[in-house]
A protein has these predicted regions:
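Consensus positions within tandem repeat domains that build extended binding/scaffold surfaces
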Residues: 32-34, 54-57, 77-82, 100-103, ...
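Structural signature of tandem-repeat unit edges
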Residues: 1-29, 39-52, 62-75, 85-98, ...
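Long, compositionally biased eukaryotic scaffolding/regulatory segments
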Residues: 416, 420, 427-448, 452-458
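Ankyrin-repeat interhelical turn/loop motif and analogous interhelical turns
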Residues: 378, 408-412
Length: 458
């Protein structure tokens, strides 16, 4: 056939074949990258007797829509259909035993896929970016799903992993953003903690009894209930009281649980993994005193909860925190963040911080100039400075003007009351041309180096 280079039963190059093509009888293998230049190929029929597709055999056949595979096929090489972005449906023959790494990488139009019995392994990145794939039936012969195998399959809605499956790799279903439920079989022994990372629509996990995993209210735990593995990001739960007996919060366990409003940890929790609470919607999480290991980025990011802790060493590992202790217990470098945490706790009604009020008021007195410079923009801080009795008379006009501009009569009343108690009569308003004019607001200095400032209300 013109343009096809065939020797010893191997089709080594298809040249620039275009349109529909039937590979002739007698070809037993397709060589590595044999069709990689065929960007105008649209349909392909492979003959009976063919047993092997080489690595990257149809790489970048961007217009290839349909492929008929023979029953005799035994091996599909790595990346065989990589970037075949127009491929819509494919029936794999029963003689295959594995789907190699990157086999269907980037097949964005693939909506139907039949994976036959006999397949025992699905390789890394095998179906990455198959964003149109809605349903997936996996055979009972399957034993392993490797790293990122179904990553980015954004239309996949439900997933039942078959009995017999033993291992699911890292980020195997990462970014499957339509996936709503996952059922885990009793046979599953290895599940990477971030296997379902980024599955933002996931509402529940289900696990067969007697296996390595268990579920309570759709939340995934180890079978012995000592490790909380994953809270589904789209769970209907608004409060999660982690059961007594849990000792570890796995990496990314509450990642992206933006609708969750309250998380309660038992006192026995000893370890909290990386990114455990990143993006969780709870305002705060109280850390237990038994805590032995806290990953540096467990609460990373401005949209994560505030950690409440009573241990200076734990506080030193946090980006933002409420410290249940005297601020003088902390090293100097942590005190700006601790003061910010105290103000946040006062604003949000965290009751335990009231025990340390005297310590923080003394800190505000000692650092008066530092905090006065931005009190006009932070009402909680302003009220604390008034309570600490450190606002000088020359600052009152600007603070009163700021309160008026923000239409906060409560702050205005507090400032006037403070002025009367400490300095006598209230200052007269400024008058220009017969009209009353507010005093200018002093430009606030940069806030302390703390992630609490500039984040807005949660």
């Amino acid at each position: 056939m013109t343009g096809l280079q065939i020797s010893d039963g191997v089709l080594r190059s298809a040249g620039d074949a275009a349109g529909a093509l039937c590979v002739p009888e007698g070809v037993t293998a397709i060589g590595d990258r044999a069709f990689s230049a065929c960007t105008d190929l649209t349909e392909l029929t492979l003959p009976e007797g063919l047993t092997e597709l080489g690595e990257g055999a149809f790489f970048n056949c961007i217009r290839l829509r349909r492929v008929t595979l023979p029953a005799t096929l035994r091996r599909i090489g790595a990346g065989a259909f990589r970037w075949c972005g127009a491929l819509e449906a494919l029936r794999l023959p029963a003689g295959l035993t594995e789907i190699a790494d990157e086999s269907f990488f980037g097949c964005a139009a693939l909506t139907e896929l039949s994976i036959p019995a006999g397949i025992s392994r699905i390789g890394s990145w095998a179906f990455y970016g198959c964003s149109a794939l809605r349903t997936l039936a996996l055979p009972a012969t399957l034993r392993r799903i490797e790293d990122s195998a179904f990553r980015g399959c954004a239309s996949l809605e439900e997933l039942t992993l078959p009995e017999g499956l033993e291992a699911v790799g890292s980020r195997a279903f990462f970014g499957c953003e339509s996936l709503k439920s996952v059922s885990l079989p009793r046979s599953l022994r290895e599940l990477d903690p971030d296997a379902f990372f980024g599955c933002t629509a996931l509402k529940e996990y289900r696990a067969e009894a007697g296996g390595a995993f268990s579920t309570v209210d759709g939340v995934l735990y180890s079978a012995d209930m000592r490790t909380l593995l994953a809270f589904p990001p789209a769970s209907m739960l608004r409060r999660c009281a982690v059961p007594e007996g849990v000792e570890e919060i796995a990496p990314a366990a509450f990642f992206g649980a933006g609708e969750l409003r309250e998380i309660t940890l038992p006192e026995r929790v000893k370890r909290i993994g990386a990114a455990a609470f990143v993006g969780a919607g709870a305002a705060s999480v109280r850390l237990p005193r038994a805590l032995e290991m806290l990953a540096d980025d467990a609460f990373a990011g401005r949209q994560s909860p505030v950690a409440i802790c009573a241990d200076p060493e734990t506080a030193a590992r946090l980006e933002k925190f409420v410290y249940l202790g005297a601020i003088d217990d902390l090293p100097e470098r942590l005190r700006p963040a601790a003061a910010a945490g105290y103000l946040w706790a006062v604003e949000h009604g965290i009751p335990d911080v009231s025990r340390f009020r005297a310590s923080y008021l003394a800190h505000f007195r000692a650092e008066r100039e530092r905090y006065l410079s931005f009190a006009a923009e932070d009402e909680t801080l302003l009220l604390q400075l008034l309570e600490a009795e450190v606002v000088p008379t020359e600052a009152l006009e600007g603070l009163l003007a700021a309160a008026a501009r923000r239409e906060r009569p409560d702050l205005t009343a507090a400032l006037l009351d403070y002025q009367r108690r400490h300095f006598g009569a209230a200052p007269a308003p400024l008058e220009l041309g017969g009209e009353t004019e507010e005093a200018p607001i002093p430009a606030p200095a940069p806030p302390p180096d703390s992630p609490f400032y500039g984040t807005g209300d949660r």
